[in-house]
Curated annotation (Swiss-Prot), chain A:
Motif (Nuclear localization signal 3): 104-105
Organism: Arabidopsis thaliana
Keyword Coiled coil: yes
Motif, Nuclear localization signal 1: chain positions: 80-81
Function: Mediates and enhances the nuclear envelope docking of RANGAP proteins mediated by WIT1 and WIT2 in the undifferentiated cells of root tips. As component of the SUN-WIP-WIT2-KAKU1 complex, mediates the transfer of cytoplasmic forces to the nuclear envelope (NE), leading to nuclear shape changes.
Protein name, as recorded: WPP domain-interacting protein 1
Swiss-Prot record, chain B:
Composition bias, Low complexity: 1-26
Lineage, broadest ranks: Eukaryota, Viridiplantae, Streptophyta, Embryophyta, Tracheophyta
Name listed for the protein in its UniProt record: WPP domain-containing protein 2
GO terms for biological process, alphabetical: lateral root development; mitotic cell cycle
Record-listed Phosphoserine modification sites: S173
InterPro entries: WPP1/2/3, WPP_dom, WPP_sf
Annotated segments matching region Disordered: 1-61, 140-180
Family annotation (Pfam families): WPP
Domain of life of the native organism: Eukaryota
Region (WPP): 44-147
Length: 489, 180
């Protein structure tokens, strides 16, 4: 992939050289025909034809969006003025107008010719708007116009006017105009991506690789177109070499182109701008063809319409007949059923009448009244007997209730008597309790007296003992003195 | 030595009054307990008396002789006096009525007494008793009317009896069919 990209870059450099030469020729034509409007148209055609060559070879390697590719290339340029213009060009049309003023101020040397071109470009924008071109296309076309001015100013310094070269350019323009019919807007977008490879930035290469995978199917078609254009470009290069003759000039031009990659974009933009009117005309023709085709289709549809209508009418005419026949048959069947049901009803009604008559006869014959009378008599007797028995039972119950009442009264009397007895007994009990208390008191008193007597007795006994002891001692004392008297003798 | 002797004496002297008091207490309690027992016996007697009439009052069957006599009197009246059936089938004399009524009542009472029912009140048995009496009344009345037709002595009575016999034939056949 990298090798292919390098080879494509080299080819792009060669193409740029050719483009620059053609651009210088265009400038010469512009100078010769300043007053007329036809000169501007011719310039546009040249730019469109040149842009065709540039667009397709670049598309070989790098498909994708133009906007993304456009910005990084600007950074590589040396001149500050060009940078300002190109950055602003991406913005709205109002910004572009301001840039146009800046161009006038900057380029004093070529003020006259540039001013005229600017004046003519403004109506281009109006025509495009009238042509109902999309806003995106307007932006691109306006950008291309301003780029053309810059590129033309730059080239005029290095190139001199040559009559032979102008003639050859005219021939080349004819060939390119014939080819422009096959061109689409896509090459313009691809054109911007090509310089990325020449700048040699690694990040951009990665992005391109990813884009290539996405657009594989598109690349095959573009390769075919590229091969056809490549052969044409080689022929042109041969012709240019023959007429120039000076090898030194060609070598110097190549070096300039290689050093400044931005110019290639400028030339591309210029050619793309000139290409617009042809593409617009072609688009108009295509639109007309589409409209005509649509009208033809409409006429065909109108011609075809009556046929299905006839078929529909036929179907409408045919379809109801069998339905009607079936409905009529159903109605007839239903009527028959109704008649049958009516006859059945009549028969049943007759049966019902017969049954009613038979029931009436049976009633009269059986004599229900007698049976009713007997039943009533039975019920009467039953009721009477039950009444008697119930009444008797009630009387018995009443008598029993009376007995019970008497018993209750007797019981009450007994209860009263028992209560009276209880009262008496309670009184007696109270008396007995009182007596018991009295007795207890008496016992207490008795015990007290007994204790006193006991004390007295004990005291008396002790006294007597004391007296006895004294007596005994006296007796003993009398006995003891006798032995003493005997001893003295 | 003396103090101890005094204490012993005191302890010896105390028991007699306690024994006396205990005897008095026992004498006090005995009459109350006897009276209470008498109360309990009285209450139980009252309860028994209350239960007996309740049992009697709840049962309607079997009826007493007085009720049966009352039923007999009613039957005799219905047979002897005029009524719808008497107008149709004729009335009976008092003597015949009494005999017929007794037979009917005895038979019905027998059937009812033989019947067994789960009800303790005897209401169902009473209903059966009444139905049996009613059936036998009708049978007896019809039989008497037929007999009178056979024994007819008066011409007017004969004509009436003949009409009655014609009328009786129908219901008799109906009864047979109904029985079948």
């Amino acid at each position: 992939m990298d090798l292919e990209s390098e080879s494509s870059a080299l080819e792009s450099v060669d193409d740029n050289v050719l483009i620059q030469q053609s651009a210088s020729n265009v400038c010469d034509d512009g100078r010769s025909l300043d007053n007329g409007s036809c000169s501007d148209e011719s310039v546009k055609l040249l730019s469109t034809s040149n842009s065709v060559e540039l667009g397709k070879p670049m598309s070989f390697d790098s498909p994708g969006d133009g906007g993304g590719a456009y910005s990084p290339v600007l950074k590589g340029q040396g001149l500050r003025k060009w940078r300002r213009i190109r950055r602003d060009l991406v913005k709205d049309t109002s910004a572009n107008m301001e840039n146009s003023k800046a161009l006038k101020r900057g380029l004093s040397g070529v003020a006259h010719s540039h001013g005229k071109q600017m004046q003519f470009q403004s109506p281009e924008v109006e025509q495009e708007s009238q042509g109902s071109v999309g806003s995106v296309n307007m932006l691109k076309s306006s950008g291309d116009g301003f780029d053309i001015l810059g590129s033309s100013g730059y080239d005029s310094r290095f190139v001199a006017g040559v009559g032979f070269s102008a003639g050859m350019d005219l021939e080349i323009d004819d060939d390119r105009s014939s080819k422009s019919s096959t061109v689409a807007r896509a090459p313009k977008v691809i054109r911007y991506e090509k310089p990325m490879i020449s700048s040699g930035q690694g990040g951009n290469i990665r992005v391109e690789n990813s884009k290539k995978h996405r657009g594989e199917s598109v690349d095959f078609e573009k390769e075919n177109s590229y091969s056809s254009l490549e052969s044409d470009s080689r022929k042109q290069s041969g012709r240019m070499m023959d007429y120039n003759g000076e090898n030194g000039e060609t070598s110097m031009r190549k070096d300039d182109a290689g050093g400044e990659g931005g110019e290639s974009i400028n030339t591309d933009n210029r050619y793309s701008d000139e290409m617009d009117p042809l593409t617009e005309a072609i688009n108009g023709f295509l639109a007309l063809q589409d409209a005509l085709e649509k009208e033809v289709q409409q006429f065909q549809e109108i011609g075809n319409e009556p046929m299905p209508q006839h078929h529909e009418q036929v179907s409408e005419a045919n379809s109801p007949h069998p339905e009607i026949v079936t409905l009529v048959n159903n109605v007839e069947q239903l009527e028959n059923m109704l008649e049958e049901t009516r006859s059945m009803l009549e028969v049943k009604e007759s049966h019902i009448r017969d049954l009613e008559s038979t029931t009436n006869q049976s009633k009269h014959s059986w004599g229900g009244t007698e049976i009713v009378v007997e039943d009533i008599f039975r019920q009467k007797i039953e009721a009477e007997i039950e009444y008697l028995i119930y009444s008797r039972s009630i009387d018995n119950l009443n008598s029993q209730m009376k007995l019970i009442d008497e018993q209750e009264s007797l019981a009450e009397e007994q209860t009263h008597e028992t209560l009276n007895k209880l009262g008496r007994v309670q009184t007696k009990a109270a008396n007995f309790t009182n007596r018991a208390q009295d007795l207890q008191n008496d016992c207490i008193e008795i015990t007290g007296t007994i204790k006193k007597r006991a004390c007295k007795i004990t005291s008396y006994v002790l006294i007597q003992l004391v007296l006895l002891s004294t007596v005994v001692l006296l007796l003993l004392s009398q006995l003891l003195p006798e032995p003493d008297t005997v001893v003295p003798t | 030595m003396a103090e101890t002797a005094e204490t012993i004496n005191t302890t010896i002297s105390s028991p007699p009054p306690e024994s006396e008091s205990s005897t008095t207490i026992s004498a006090m309690t005995d009459p109350t307990s006897q009276e209470a027992a008498s109360k309990d016996t009285d209450l139980t007697k009252e309860a028994e008396s209350e239960k007996k009439p309740g049992g009697i009052s709840l049962r309607i069957w079997p009826p007493t002789q007085k009720t049966r006599d009352a039923v007999l009197n009613r039957l005799i009246e219905t047979l002897s006096t005029e009524s719808i059936l008497s107008k149709r089938y004729g009335t009976l004399k008092s003597d015949d009525a009494t005999t017929v009524a007794k037979l009917i009542e005895e038979e019905a009472y027998g059937v009812a007494s033989n019947a067994v029912s789960s009800d303790d009140d005897g209401i169902k048995i009473l209903e059966l008793y009444s139905k049996e009496i009613s059936k036998r009344m009708l049978e007896s009345v019809k039989a008497r009317s037929n007999a009178s037709v056979g024994n007819g002595s008066v011409e007017d009575a004969n004509t009436d009896a003949s009409e009655v016999s014609k009328d009786d034939a129908g219901p008799a056949s109906e009864e047979e069919k109904s029985e079948a």
